[in-house]
Structures are given as structure tokens and as C-alpha cells.
């Protein structure tokens, strides 16, 4: 018996040796596995940063609005963000009002700069081929809406743009020129489907240029979101001694004005009597 026990004890280390030799270390994790394993930690850190920033923003906005923080201890995240947006808008209006009181031409400069940028975008889209027509129309319509909102912007102590005196005509008998910091040119709407002005040739467009912005004789045609088109007329075209009466062209080619008559009630006006701003 003792011999058998000694034999078993002596053989047990030898039997365990091959098992320990055959063990292999764990394979290193790939980049995707590492990102997957660390994603919960990163998400936790991200939420902690958001909550910390919102907490600081809450303290700042309550101090700026001079509100008691004890009464607003349970503000939701959306409420904090809305209060911040409103406060920043009020600050922006106050800064614009202060700037206008110092220099009344600030708003005019802003409008002139926006109008110039809009003209550059329209000119690029009019001459660039391969641009999707739907995207082009949506972009030009969005810019036209923004231009309308900017023209309607008023601040305390400043008259409405519609009540302001028209800008003086540019000096010299040359073509239409924009004076420095002049307000944006007016838009003359034309019903959808109207024929383009025959006085000028359109610039180079893509295959679907019929629905995009065009330039005829120096005047830009901007499509509106409701399917109509509008002429972008320079200020120099309105430098007349008498009042200017806009004339709209319909699909039939007849003019519609204060003295116009329908084809059924009387003879239509001739082509010479139609006012064409794109002709000198």
C-alpha cells in the first residue's frame, strides 16, 4: 500500500505538466471589439458632460435673468435650452439696436451684404451645369424667403423699409449700378408659366434650365416656392422721373396694368405699349 501511494503521488505532477504547457494566452482584441467594449463607458462620460454643461448653463441663465434658483430647482433640460435661446435672441436684438443708434446704416449694410451674397449664389447656380434642378429651386426659394424677412426687419427708432425714401439714382448715364450699401433690389413677381423676356439672351444653363434661375439682359429671374417667378431688378432701373407701374405678363402675352383691358372687352395692347424694364 505505501508503495502504491508513492507511485500515485509521483505520477501526478508529470500528468499535469502537458496541460500547463498546452495553454495559450488570450488573443488581443481587435479595434472593433475594443470600441464595442468601451462604448458603454464613452456613453456614460458623454452623458456626464452634457449634464454638467446643462447644470452650468442653468446657473448662468438664472443669474442673467435675475431669477431665484431655489424656485427653479427642477427645470427640465428643454426648458433650460429654450430660456437660453430666448436670452441670446434678446441680447442680439439689444446689440443691433445699440449699433443702429450709433450708426443707422448698419442694417442697410447687412441687407446689402446679404443681397450681394444671394446674387453670387444665384449667378453661380445659373451658370453651373450638373446641379439638380429641384435642389437649385429649393435653395433659391429659401434665399428669397430670407431676403423677404430681412427686408421686413425693423428695430426701435428705425422706420419700416417700405416707408423709407428710395435710394438716389447712381451718377452718370451708364448702365444700372448699385450704390454702396444700397438696399436690395425689389422683386417683380411674374405668374408661373410666363414667357421669358425677349430682350436678352439667357446665360449658359444645364439641360433643365427652364425651371432654374436665369439672367435675361442683366436681370435675374428667381423662382419662388409657390411655382411663380420673380425678376431681380437693379435699383438703377427704377431711376425714372415719373412713377413706375409694374406690368405683369400672362400666358397669353397680354399686359395686365391699370389701363389694360381684357381681350374679350376690347383690343389688346400692342407690344410697343408694354413696359419692359430690361430695355433702355
Swiss-Prot record:
Its main location: nucleus. One of its GO terms (cellular component) is cytoplasm. Keywords: DNA-binding, Nucleus, Repressor, Transcription, Transcription regulation, Ubl conjugation. Residues 10-21 have a biased composition (Low complexity). Residues 26-35 have a biased composition (Basic and acidic residues). Transcriptional repressor of genes that require a bHLH protein for their transcription. May act as a negative regulator of myogenesis by inhibiting the functions of MYOD1 and ASH1. Binds DNA on N-box motifs: 5'-CACNAG-3' with high affinity and on E-box motifs: 5'-CANNTG-3' with low affinity. May play a role in a functional FA core complex response to DNA cross-link damage, being required for the stability and nuclear localization of FA core complex proteins, as well as for FANCD2 monoubiquitination in response to DNA damage. Residues 34-91 form the bHLH domain. It is found in: Nucleus. Has a particular type of basic domain (presence of a helix-interrupting proline) that binds to the N-box (CACNAG), rather than the canonical E-box (CANNTG). The C-terminal WRPW motif is a transcriptional repression domain necessary for the interaction with Groucho/TLE family members, transcriptional corepressors recruited to specific target DNA by Hairy-related proteins. Residues 1-44, 157-200, 254-280 are annotated as: Disordered. GO terms for biological process: adenohypophysis development; amacrine cell differentiation; artery morphogenesis; ascending aorta morphogenesis; BMP signaling pathway; Cajal-Retzius cell differentiation; cardiac neural crest cell development involved in outflow tract morphogenesis; cell adhesion. Transmembrane segments: none annotated. Transcription repression requires formation of a complex with a corepressor protein of the Groucho/TLE family. Interacts (via WPRW motif) with TLE1, and more weakly with TLE2. Interacts with HES6. Interacts with SIRT1. Interacts with an FA complex, composed of FANCA, FANCF, FANCG and FANCL, but not of FANCC, nor FANCE. This is Transcription factor HES-1. It comes from the Eukaryota. Residues 110-143 form the Orange domain. Residues 254-271 have a biased composition (Polar residues). GO terms for molecular function: chromatin binding; DNA binding; DNA-binding transcription repressor activity, RNA polymerase II-specific; E-box binding; histone deacetylase binding; HLH domain binding; JUN kinase binding; N-box binding. Residues 164-174, 181-200 have a biased composition (Pro residues). (Microbial infection) Ubiquitinated via human cytomegalovirus/HCMV protein IE1 that assembles a HES1 ubiquitination complex; leading to HES1 proteasomal degradation.
Amino acid at each position: 500500500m505505501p508503495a502504491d501511494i508513492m507511485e500515485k503521488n509521483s505520477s501526478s505532477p508529470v500528468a499535469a505538466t502537458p496541460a500547463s504547457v498546452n495553454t495559450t494566452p488570450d488573443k488581443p482584441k481587435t479595434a472593433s471589439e475594443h470600441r464595442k467594449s468601451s462604448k458603454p463607458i464613452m456613453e456614460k462620460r458623454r452623458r456626464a458632460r452634457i449634464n454638467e454643461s446643462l447644470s452650468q448653463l442653468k446657473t448662468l441663465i438664472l443669474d442673467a435673468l435675475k431669477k431665484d434658483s431655489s424656485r427653479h430647482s427642477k427645470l427640465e433640460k428643454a426648458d433650460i435650452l429654450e430660456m437660453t435661446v430666448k436670452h441670446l435672441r434678446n441680447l442680439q436684438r439689444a446689440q443691433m439696436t445699440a449699433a443702429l443708434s450709433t450708426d443707422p446704416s448698419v442694417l442697410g449694410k447687412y441687407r446689402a451684404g446679404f443681397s450681394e451674397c444671394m446674387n453670387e449664389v444665384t449667378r453661380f447656380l445659373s451658370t453651373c451645369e450638373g446641379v439638380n434642378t429641384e435642389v437649385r429651386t429649393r435653395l433659391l426659394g429659401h434665399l428669397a424667403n430670407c431676403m423677404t424677412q430681412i427686408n421686413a426687419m425693423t428695430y426701435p427708432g428705425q422706420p419700416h423699409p417700405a416707408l423709407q425714401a428710395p435710394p438716389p439714382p447712381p451718377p452718370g448715364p451708364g448702365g444700372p449700378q448699385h450704390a454702396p450699401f444700397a438696399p436690395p433690389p425689389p422683386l417683380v413677381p411674374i405668374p408661373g408659366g410666363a414667357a421669358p423676356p425677349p430682350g436678352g439672351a439667357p446665360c449658359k444653363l444645364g439641360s433643365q434650365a427652364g425651371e432654374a434661375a436665369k439672367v435675361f439682359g442683366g436681370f435675374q429671374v428667381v423662382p419662388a416656392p409657390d411655382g411663380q417667378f420673380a425678376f431681380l431688378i437693379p435699383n438703377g432701373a427704377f431711376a425714372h422721373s415719373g412713377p413706375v407701374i409694374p406690368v405683369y405678363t400672362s400666358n397669353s402675352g397680354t399686359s395686365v396694368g391699370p389701363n389694360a383691358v381684357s381681350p374679350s372687352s376690347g383690343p389688346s395692347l400692342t407690344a410697343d405699349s408694354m413696359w419692359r424694364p430690361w430695355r433702355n
